């Protein structure tokens, strides 16, 4: 009989052993190799004693998968999923099961990273290009982004673009029509305050009466559901050099005249209605489309068409010089993570339904709205909007209607002025319309849906006037007209997936990105209707499950970070930075020190840091780093003293972007506090802190947390993300507020930074499950194992490559930087060559040239096994041997496996390959482990310069893919 106790047999910590890659024996072997007796001994060697936490976390014990699912099922069951006709940018939708199963629930799609390595990302790049084509066609404009975070932040980006490109250079006022969504106005006002813009609101028709405008914003259709032909108004505004921006409903554009045809300069909106659940506010992809002449001022990523070295059509991210990782504080936006997974879902939705299928859906929604309007009119209810697509507004006995609606499990929109609104959706049926008659009119109304429908068919409908009926063709590309059976759709999705390298194939060692396991059990609740189908503006009593989940997750994050409160609203790390800096700004203003506007940022900082500081209305002053990569204290003291009167804050990353624990971090905090500033600690590297130290304990005042890094939300190929901020008590009143829903800790006058009060709440169950399953012990052990993996890999690679920057006891924290510059000087081989050659070995490249040009930054997470680490090491050692052959002159600098990487099937089938000085086998099967699990790049190295000089960002002819 076994000697194990019942507690041991119950395996409460089984998930912990599944999440962590190396088993106990492998961990000990690795510890022996790096010269440590245990994980605790290694921790003591790495983490400065002055900042060690000195306590265990208090987030509970570890749990098994079944127990974790049972706990979260209890929370889900506390949510009441009513039929929500609230609208306001959030609508019911049917997620095609072929997309649900093969994209949303498929690690081949949700575990990939942003396509910085396009040769191994052609599948999702094509899906994103489809999203851009969809956006271009429906809006009637020229150039679309790869997605933004949500509709409201897209509106703020539209305002910023308008200011950049407007010829009315002296104008400082932005007009917002008073019938836009309230959350949109809220986010726009927040951004405008930072930029010093004046916001004026009023009826849309009065926009042209203002003379000092650089831009204007309109909603199409508006909050009440009214349709307006803006063609004449837009012409008047353009004559005054006003940039016209429009928030549009994507489903309505299937039937309506496009804003581009009316003369809009920029059109944005949410793609949520195209097969993405409401998720209590997100995540959803926003579309953003502009005229071609504004392309250099566009925010966010843009996918463009280029050529590879064989002349084959290939896709890649275009015009990256606009972005934060290059332009820093001069960037158009701080957008980094966006919503690629959700953009892909929306694009696949359009591909699956095609233009004809979309017309059927849109016409059904519109017909049901016509039926509802006709029935109400027949019973004496006056519909306030005279034209509509899917939304009606009317005045009735609000109390009686609300009571009947709640009794029926239905949510309507109740405006402050006694107006009731109803927005219909793809999920609405004729039975639902009959139920709405009962709710609005009471029993005994005698209306029959079929009879009203027959009458409308006979007499026609004028709710969409002829001038607003769409005449432009859309989605004519073959991609949107070829995959309408589930078999063909499934195979199309699979063909694209096969072109991409994700975590389900191999380790992704991107430094500062924390590409850890996104466990299946953590992902499961995301698809549950109790989480997926909740409207963010539903009555709070219906969302008790979400309320408890968000509360518990916030409490855990408070314990982990050492802060006093958490704000869940920011829906990306960059938005978290922005929100944290706004809290600092408002704190200073509350003390009569609004002049404090200088943000100190070390030269090694993430590009989002200076970009976010600029968005928050701050001036960036860069501080130096010493030769070891640490913040130069002498320079910091001098800069802090120099700007003391105006010092707002410092933004630091810990461990540093150089991958070490700086011994002087508390001194850094003290210097800033002594001069009246606040400390913003970037949470990008939190995976090396959890359970060992904490930003609040160190001395920081505010941090954002990348839940899509440290807390297991997947990267989705470029989003979604979540960037909640933790704050000390004195900053808590200054976190983001919301015009529609209060969160509980913010002051009333705080503006919003995201469209939804709790950001992308639909993915918070992932992080909740991650913490619930690992518990206090597992979280700490995960951090320690991540550091063990990093130090093991570093010591192995240091025998072949120079390693920059080490901390105490010659250790690194959780990532290392390999210096390729000496090898480049000796051989001509670049860090780019090594990155592309790793593709041939089946690996995604590490982070290139950040934070130091000419380097590779490698971060192996705790989820990677010793076997996978050894396979990566084997690849890097083999590549070093290849570099040596170039160095010795055996291979020419311009014709070797590195210079020609990555290699494709086309290469090895080409008879001309025989002229190369290396074999086909070495090109594509450089090691036996590669032969056993080969990943084939589908294009050769892509010409970025060609792509930007010949910018094309829409779908190409099908023949180009052949």
From Swiss-Prot:
- What is the recorded name of this protein? Glycine dehydrogenase (decarboxylating)
Tell me the enzyme class.
Answer: oxidoreductase
Q: Which residues carry this modification: N6-(pyridoxal phosphate)lysine?
A: 709
User: Which cysteines does the record link by disulfide bonds?
Assistant: none
Please provide the record's keywords in A-Z order: Oxidoreductase, Pyridoxal phosphate
Q: Name one GO molecular function term.
A: glycine binding
**What does the record give as the organism's lineage?**
Bacteria, Pseudomonadati, Pseudomonadota, Gammaproteobacteria, Alteromonadales
Q: What does this protein do?
A: The glycine cleavage system catalyzes the degradation of glycine. The P protein binds the alpha-amino group of glycine through its pyridoxal phosphate cofactor; CO(2) is released and the remaining methylamine moiety is then transferred to the lipoamide cofactor of the H protein.
Recorded GO cellular component terms are: cytosol; glycine cleavage complex
Query: What are its E.C. numbers?
Result: 1.4.4.2
Q: Does the keyword Oxidoreductase apply?
A: yes
Catalytic activity annotation:
N(6)-[(R)-lipoyl]-L-lysyl-[glycine-cleavage complex H protein] + glycine + H(+) = N(6)-[(R)-S(8)-aminomethyldihydrolipoyl]-L-lysyl-[glycine-cleavage complex H protein] + CO2
As for family, the record states:
Belongs to the GcvP family.
Instruction: Spell out the subunit comment.
Output: The glycine cleavage system is composed of four proteins: P, T, L and H.
What Gene Ontology biological process does one annotation of this record name?
glycine decarboxylation via glycine cleavage system
- Write down the required cofactor(s): pyridoxal 5'-phosphate
């Amino acid at each position: 009989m076994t000697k194990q106790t019942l507690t041991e047999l119950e395996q409460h910590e089984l998930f912990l052993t599944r999440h962590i890659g190396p088993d106990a024996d492998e961990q000990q072997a690795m510890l022996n190799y790096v010269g440590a007796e245990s994980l605790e001994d290694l921790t003591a060697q790495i983490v400065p004693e002055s900042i060690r936490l000195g306590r265990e976390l208090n987030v509970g014990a570890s749990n098994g998968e079944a127990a974790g699912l049972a706990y979260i099922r209890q929370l889900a069951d506390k949510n009441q999923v009513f039929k929500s006709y609230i609208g306001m940018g959030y609508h019911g939708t049917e997620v095609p099961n072929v997309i649900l199963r093969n994209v949303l629930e498929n690690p081949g799609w949700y575990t990939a990273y942003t396509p910085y390595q396009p040769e191994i990302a052609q599948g999702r790049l094509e899906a994103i290009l489809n999203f851009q084509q969809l956006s271009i066609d429906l809006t009637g404009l020229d150039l679309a982004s790869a997605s933004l975070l949500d509709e409201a932040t897209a509106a703020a980006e539209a305002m910023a673009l308008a200011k950049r490109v407007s010829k009315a250079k002296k104008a400082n006022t932005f007009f917002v029509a008073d019938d836009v969504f309230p959350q949109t106005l809220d986010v726009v006002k927040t951004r405008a305050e930072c930029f010093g813009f004046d916001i004026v609101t009023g009826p849309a028709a009065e926009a042209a009466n203002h003379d000092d405008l650089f831009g204007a914003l309109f909603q199409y259709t508006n909050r009440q559901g009214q349709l307006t032909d803006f063609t004449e108004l837009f012409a008047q505004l353009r004559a005054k050099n006003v940039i016209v921006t429009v928030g549009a409903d994507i489903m309505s554009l299937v039937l309506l005249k496009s804003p581009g045809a009316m003369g809009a300069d920029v059109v944005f909106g949410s793609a949520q209605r195209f097969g993405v659940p409401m998720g209590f506010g997100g995540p959803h992809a926003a579309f953003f489309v502009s005229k071609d002449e504004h392309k250099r001022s566009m925010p966010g990523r843009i996918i463009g068409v280029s050529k590879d070295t064989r002349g084959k059509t290939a896709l890649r991210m275009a015009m990256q010089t606009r972005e934060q990782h290059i332009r820093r504080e001069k960037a158009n936006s701080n957008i980094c993570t966006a919503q690629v997974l959700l953009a892909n879902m929306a694009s696949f939705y359009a591909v699956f339904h095609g233009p004809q299928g979309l017309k059927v859906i849109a016409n059904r929604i519109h017909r049901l709205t016509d039926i509802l309007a006709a029935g109400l009119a027949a019973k004496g209810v006056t519909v306030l909007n005279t034209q509509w697509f899917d939304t009606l507004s009317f005045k009735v006995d609000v109390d009686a209607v609300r009571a009947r609606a709640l009794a029926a499990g239905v949510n309507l929109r109740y405006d402050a002025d006694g107006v009731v609104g109803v927005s219909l959706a793809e999920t609405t049926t004729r039975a639902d319309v009959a139920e709405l008659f009962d709710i609005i009119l009471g029993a005994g109304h005698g209306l029959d849906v079929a009879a009203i429908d027959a009458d409308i068919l006979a007499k026609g409908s004028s709710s969409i006037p002829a001038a607003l009926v769409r005449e432009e063709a859309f989605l004519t590309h073959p991609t949107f007209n070829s995959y309408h059976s589930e078999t063909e759709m499934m195979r199309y999705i699979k063909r694209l997936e096969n072109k991409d390298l994700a975590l389900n194939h191999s380790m992704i060692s991107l430094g500062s990105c924390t590409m850890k396991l996104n466990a299946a059990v953590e992902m499961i609740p995301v698809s549950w209707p109790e989480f997926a189908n909740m409207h963010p503006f539903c009555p709070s009593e219906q969302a008790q499950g979400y309320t408890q989940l968000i509360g518990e997750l916030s409490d855990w994050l408070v314990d982990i970070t050492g802060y006093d409160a958490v704000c869940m609203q920011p829906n990306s790390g960059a938005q978290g930075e922005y929100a944290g800096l706004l809290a600092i700004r408002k704190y200073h203003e509350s003390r009569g020190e609004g002049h404090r506007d200088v943000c100190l940022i070390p030269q090694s900082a993430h590009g989002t840091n200076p970009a976010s500081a600029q968005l928050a209305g701050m001036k960036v002053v860069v501080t130096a780093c010493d030769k070891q990569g640490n913040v130069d204290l002498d320079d910091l003291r001098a800069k802090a003293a120099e700007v003391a009167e105006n010092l707002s804050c410092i933004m630091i990353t810990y461990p540093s972007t150089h991958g070490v624990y700086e011994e002087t971090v508390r001194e850094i905090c003290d210097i800033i506090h002594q001069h009246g500033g606040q400390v913003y600690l970037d949470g990008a590297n939190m995976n090396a802190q959890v359970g060992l130290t904490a930003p609040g304990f160190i001395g920081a005042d505010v941090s954002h947390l990348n839940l899509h890094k440290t807390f297991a939300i997947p990267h989705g190929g470029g989003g979604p993300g979540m960037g909640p901020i933790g704050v000390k008590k004195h900053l808590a009143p200054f976190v983001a507020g919301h015009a529609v829903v209060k969160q509980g800790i913010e002051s009333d006058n705080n503006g919003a930074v995201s469209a939804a009060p709790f950001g992308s709440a639909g993915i918070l169950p992932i992080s909740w499950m991650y913490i619930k399953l690992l518990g206090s012990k597992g979280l700490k052990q995960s951090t320690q194992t991540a550091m063990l993996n990093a130090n093991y890999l570093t010591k192995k690679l240091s025998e072949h490559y120079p390693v920059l920057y080490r901390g105490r006891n010659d250790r690194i924290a959780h990532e290392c930087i390999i210096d390729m510059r000496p090898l480049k000087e000796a051989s001509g081989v670049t860090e780019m060559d090594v990155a592309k050659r790793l593709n041939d070995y089946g690996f995604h490249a590490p982070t290139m040239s950040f934070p130091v040009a000419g380097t590779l930054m490698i971060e192996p997470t705790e989820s990677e096994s010793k076997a996978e680490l050894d396979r990566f090491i084997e690849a890097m050692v083999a590549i070093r041997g290849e570099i040596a052959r170039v160095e010795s002159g055996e291979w020419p600098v311009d014709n070797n496996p590195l210079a020609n990487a990555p290699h494709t099937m086309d290469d090895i089938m080409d008879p001309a390959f025989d002229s190369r000085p290396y074999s086909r086998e070495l090109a594509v099967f450089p090691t036996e482990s590669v032969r056993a699990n080969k990943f084939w790049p589908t294009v050769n190295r892509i010409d970025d310069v060609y792509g930007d000089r010949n910018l094309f960002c829409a779908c190409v002819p099908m023949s180009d893919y052949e």
